[in-house]
Amino acid sequence: MDIDGVDDDLHILDPELLQLPGLSPSPLKPTSLIADDLFSQWLSLPETATLVKSLIDDAKSGTPTNKSKNLPSVFLSSSTPPLSPRSSSGSPRFSRQRTSPPSLHSPLRSLKEPKRQLIPQFYYQHGRPPAKELKEQCLSMVDQVFSNYIDGLHVDEFKSITKQVCKLPSFLSPALFRKIDPNCTDIVTRDAFIKYWIDGNMLTMDTASQIYNILRQQGCSYLRQADFKPVLDELLATHPGLEFLRTISEFQERYAETVIYRIFYYINRSGTGCLTLRELRRGNLIAAMQQLDEEDDINKIIRYFSYEHFYVIYCKFWELDGDHDCFIDKDNLIKYGNNALTYRIVDRIFSQIPRKFTSKVEGKMSYEDFVYFILAEEDKSSEPSLEYWFKCVDLDGNGVITSNEMQFFFEEQLHRMECITQEAVLFSDILCQIIDMIGPEKENCITLQDLKGSKLSANVFNILFNLNKFMAFETRDPFLIRQEREDPNLTEWDRFAQREYARLSMEEDVDEVSNGSADVWDEPLEPPF
């Protein structure tokens, strides 16, 4: 094509010149071929040659190119290009097709970019704020309490806020007071309480989260044993069921320790000594704490807080601790339950396989270690107890109990039975009995999950290393069967504590009678301290 022979005047591009020849009835060309034909036809137009020559001259002379002026007028006359050429065959495909690019109002663009919807906030770093009605209701109760205390409340006056406004057990009052008053000014004002309880979104939390946040230390994501000490101190100072202990500080401290150890034994399933919010929610501690405000008889709250249960635990420890140095060794523990345990299982306990001792004295068990032991021994059906004894019997620590490991422990049981002229039982028979009771997934071994899935798991461990309980199981002790039927809701530990407290109380009464106390039978049974 001779560009130099073309007139320099810029002509208006006629859209009709871009029309393709009429289509034959033959099959339609592919879209790419149609585009090539259109482009070739455009290049052959005189106006195109003029435009190209003009752009080349501008480029050689260094003149800035004004693209909008150089474009043919057809591209400036409308914001959209013209329709594609009509086919002579009248094909509906060409009569309907548009080549315009997508615009803001294009339905294609609407499909690709849907309108943004406003999603309401669902995450709140410090908890969901209270609803307007709930907030107003709480403020009304706060105003009612603080109306008589314009300058604020002291700790002994704060209990009404804890119970009426916060709906929490009253013995949490000092802990809540100190949380709002970290600078120890000994007074909590209305504004300070509102800032902590309402503005801090404590109002909308569940009870477990509220108690967890009140008790935990700043910056900690768990509860320690020491965090429960203020709660127990207030309970001992105010609960009518513990009034008799208020003049005996030594046993107040022992009672508080025992309650805390029991809480961590059953609820702190990780065994780390760090109680998480999840563990607190999963346990039954909150229900027991709420019951304390409703029940004056502390012994009716058998979960954690029963004084009778503490009495049994402490007296058992005192009986074994011959030199009363507050430590127990192997020789002491082997006497537990009238020498019921085997030496092999006691060795495993003192090897600290099921749990590391808190005692700093080599070969000695502390009072806390004993609490864990006695709860495991007398409540073998509970999950913490099953985990405790499973670790003891799993000699190689591979997560399964094999027949060889069970035989290792039963050998000593068999020897003890022979020593007391008791009819011996073959281990093969015992093994079949255990398999029938547990129904493990694999018959050649027993897993922890197998034990947790059976109601007879406690009997397995009694067979292996507790002779007295094994014999009671074999003879089907009618007293134990009757006791289980009388109250099926009680745990093994509850029934044990009930029996032992009755026995210990009777022994105490006999001692008083032998010492010349004539009025002992006229007095109700109660602990000596």
Swiss-Prot record:
Keyword Metal-binding among UniProt keywords: yes
Biased composition (Acidic residues): 520-529
Keyword Calcium: yes
Stored InterPro entries: EF-hand-dom_pair (IPR011992), EF-hand_13 (IPR041534), EF_Hand_1_Ca_BS (IPR018247), EF_hand_dom (IPR002048)
Pfam families the record matches: EF-hand_13
A molecular function (GO) term: calcium ion binding
Residues engaged in binding Ca(2+): 394, 396, 398, 405
Subunit structure comment from the entry: PP2A consists of a common heterodimeric core enzyme, composed of a 36 kDa catalytic subunit (subunit C) and a 65 kDa constant regulatory subunit (PR65 or subunit A), that associates with a variety of regulatory subunits. Proteins that associate with the core dimer include three families of regulatory subunits B (the R2/B/PR55/B55, R3/B''/PR72/PR130/PR59 and R5/B'/B56 families) and cell signaling molecules.
PANTHER family: PHOSPHATASE 2A REGULATORY SUBUNIT-RELATED, SERINE_THREONINE PROTEIN PHOSPHATASE 2A REGULATORY SUBUNIT B''EPSILON-RELATED
Record's function text: Probable regulatory subunit of type 2A protein phosphatase.
Name used for this protein in its record: Probable serine/threonine protein phosphatase 2A regulatory subunit B''epsilon
